[in-house]
């Protein structure tokens, strides 16, 4: 009986084992078939005669999203998409460095509220963009970076300029994808663009390999051998390559939706808004601090301005919110922010973050009631419970929140004494600036005085791009944006080199504006070559270079603290002549023509209005205006 039972058990085991093995084999075969796209190929066709290419799909999606410009430095990996964009009426603007292309896309994104687009070639082309992409991430700017790549089959096999680009950009971007089939271009780009603009905006990266962008006949020529090998293994390899080729192009030209996907923008709840209304209604000395997020869509700048004016609370404007109220608005307080924050009993941080710009929250009075609004939860609570504590923290869109807050406070009035106190302190501080403008300097021109002349010269339609350290930081105190979205600086990352790219993007998307660039001489070194770009593309901008022959923002603290100016010295370079060599117009200001400063600025303005890119090289000396402002 035992022998019979054992035999029966063994007899049942082997069929079960064979069934399991067969099932495993079938599953493996089906998995391989799925990965090779064999099932999809059964239901869809490959058009082997088509001369269309993936670049056309890229261009179609960009056009459907209202993209007007693509910034680039050309490379063979991305040529099809550039040619396709040009054919669809999207202006392709080529720069002299890839980082400039991304900075230009960043400027377009900030000024238009839509996605800005840059396209660069593989490997070094992409690595050259890293600083600009990180700057866009920190500034929360929706930039789409399109990057070329080696063919899908040649990745990780030593192809030219082939690196792991995805690992490089994942820490920098909200969304990263590598397109592996032509049919995936459209849905991938739609998803990427929606991700860039949803929630907290930021950069996204889409990798487009060579064989996804080029037409079938070109890819076939490179991928499939013309002569069929005799060996079995050789024939298997050819079959595999033919299948890979088919999977790349199967269903490539079937109609697909190309337009924008819905955006996910967080909103404050009615209960949160009501609690904030109650807090602010009890304030005696309220203060509003607006940051860049306040200018994000969907709330237009004019509606936000009307809301701030209706609210009637004194405010400080930072980042992209600079200029929201125009010049000399009675509610806009420009000086002594730390002192004002210490005195306020209720502070609304609307898009402002408690990072180094607000001394990590230490400038806030612990007895004040703090309302903070931000789309990003990390920014919302940054350094809270260390140096400050919010009474109400609202994760939501800042502009929409401000509209609802004002609606809830209709009829609320505050004593004019508080605003008048802040304005008086403002006026006293600005008088000290006027006094410093009259102080002599050892050589050349007083930069404070020069910037005062610039402030008086700027037209109402000026759009300011600022790129530098000491000269630009001084300008931030003295030069006022003429309106909303009329001031472009790098943002919290403090990146040097944004100037040319920002100016390029700004002038193209706002051609009616006069784009004035304020450069430090150190920062100008990054942008000089792009005057070739301005000339070639007929983009007239005017650059004012505060030339004090050094990295003065660093030296003003390094020298007294460490006793050396090592690596801080530059030369009084003839930047205006270098620009002239690139086809731009060049002017110079120094002590020799001090009495003609305004005249020369007007001359540069007229040249710019006549269609020229202009560099005004302003030789300046050094003052104690920013002593103590160590840059770490």
From Swiss-Prot:
Keyword set, alphabetical order: Endoplasmic reticulum, Fatty acid metabolism, Lipid metabolism, Lyase, Magnesium, Membrane, Metal-binding, Phosphoprotein, Thiamine pyrophosphate, Transmembrane, Transmembrane helix
Compartment(s): Endoplasmic reticulum membrane
PROSITE patterns registered for this protein in UniProt: TPP_ENZYMES (PS00187)
Binding site for Mg(2+): 521, 547
TM regions (residue ranges): 13-33
Membrane topology term: Single-pass membrane protein
EC top class, as a word: lyase
GO-annotated biological processes: fatty acid alpha-oxidation
Amino acids binding thiamine diphosphate: 98
Pfam families recorded: TPP_enzyme_C, TPP_enzyme_M, TPP_enzyme_N
In-chain residues carrying the UniProt-annotated modification Phosphoserine: 369
InterPro entries: DHS-like_NAD/FAD-binding_dom, THDP-binding, Thiamin_PyroP_enz_cen_dom, Thiamin_PyroP_enz_TPP-bd_dom, TPP-bd_CS, TPP_enz, TPP_enzyme_TPP-bd
Function as written in the Swiss-Prot or TrEMBL entry: Endoplasmic reticulum 2-OH acyl-CoA lyase involved in the cleavage (C1 removal) reaction in the fatty acid alpha-oxydation in a thiamine pyrophosphate (TPP)-dependent manner. Involved in the phytosphingosine degradation pathway.
Protein name per the record: 2-hydroxyacyl-CoA lyase 2
């Amino acid at each position: 009986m035992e022998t019979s039972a054992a035999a029966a058990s063994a007899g049942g085991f082997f069929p079960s084992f064979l069934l399991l093995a067969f099932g495993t084999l079938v599953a493996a075969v089906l998995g391989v078939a799925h990965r090779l796209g064999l099932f999809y190929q059964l239901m869809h066709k490959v058009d082997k005669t088509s001369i269309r290419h993936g670049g056309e799909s890229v261009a179609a999606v960009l056009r459907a999203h209202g993209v007007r410009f693509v910034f680039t430095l050309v490379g063979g990996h991305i040529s099809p998409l550039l040619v396709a964009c040009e054919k669809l009426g999207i202006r392709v603007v080529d720069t002299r460095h890839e980082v400039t292309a991304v900075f230009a896309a960043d400027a377009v994104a900030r000024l238009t509220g839509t996605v800005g687009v840059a396209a660069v070639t593989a490997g070094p082309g992409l690595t050259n963009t890293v600083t600009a992409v990180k700057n866009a991430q920190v500034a929360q700017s929706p930039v789409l970076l399109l990057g070329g790549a080696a063919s899908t089959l040649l990745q990780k096999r030593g192809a030219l300029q082939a690196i792991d680009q995805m690992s490089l950009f994942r820490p920098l971007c909200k969304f990263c994808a590598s397109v592996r089939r032509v049919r995936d271009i459209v849905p991938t780009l739609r998803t990427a663009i929606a991700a860039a603009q949803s929630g907290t905006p930021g950069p996204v990266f889409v990798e487009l390999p060579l064989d996804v962008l080029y037409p079938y006949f070109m890819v076939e020529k490179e991928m499939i051998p013309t002569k069929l090998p005799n060996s079995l293994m050789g024939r298997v390899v050819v079959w595999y390559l033919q299948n890979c080729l088919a999977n790349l192009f199967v269903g490539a030209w079937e109609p697909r939706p190309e337009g924008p996907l819905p955006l996910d923008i967080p909103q404050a709840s009615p209960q949160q808004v009501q609690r904030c209304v109650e807090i602010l209604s009890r304030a005696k000395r309220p203060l509003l601090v607006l940051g860049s997020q306040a200018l994000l869509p969907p709330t237009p700048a004019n509606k936000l301005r009307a809301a701030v004016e209706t609210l009637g609370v004194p405010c400080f404007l930072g980042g992209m919110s600079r200029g929201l109220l125009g010049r000399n608005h009675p509610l806009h307080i420009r000086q002594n922010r730390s002192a004002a924050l210490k005195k306020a009993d209720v502070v609304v941080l609307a898009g402002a973050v408690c990072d180094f710009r607000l001394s990590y929250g230490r400038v806030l009075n612990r007895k004040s009631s703090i309302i903070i609004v931000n789309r990003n939860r990390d920014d919302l609570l940054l350094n809270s419970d260390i140096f400050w504590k919010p009474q109400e923290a609202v994760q939501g869109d800042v502009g929409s929140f401000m509209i609802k807050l004002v609606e809830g406070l209709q009829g609320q009035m505050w004593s004019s004494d508080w605003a008048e106190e802040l304005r008086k302190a403002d006026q006293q501080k600005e008088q000290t600036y006027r006094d410093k403008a009259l102080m002599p300097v050892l050589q050349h021109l007083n930069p404070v005085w020069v910037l005062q002349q610039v402030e008086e010269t700027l037209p109402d339609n000026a759009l300011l791009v600022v790129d530098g350290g000491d000269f630009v930081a001084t300008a931030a105190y003295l030069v006022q944006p003429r309106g909303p979205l009329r001031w472009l600086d790098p943002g919290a990352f403090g990146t040097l080199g944004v100037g040319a790219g920002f100016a390029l993007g700004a002038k193209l998307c706002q051609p009616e504006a006069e784009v004035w660039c304020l450069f430090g001489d150190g920062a100008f070194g990054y942008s000089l070559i792009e005057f070739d770009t301005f000339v070639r593309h007929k983009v007239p901008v005017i650059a004012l270079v505060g030339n004090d022959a050094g990295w003065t923002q660093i030296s003003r603290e390094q020298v007294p603290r460490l006793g050396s100016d090592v690596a801080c010295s530059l030369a009084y370079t003839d930047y205006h002549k270098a620009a002239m060599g690139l086809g731009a117009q060049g002017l110079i200001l120094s002590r020799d023509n001090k009495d003609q400063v305004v005249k020369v600025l007007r001359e540069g303005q007229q040249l710019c209005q006549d269609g020229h890119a202009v560099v005004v090289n302003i030789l300046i000396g050094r003052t104690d205006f920013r002593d103590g402002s160590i840059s770490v």
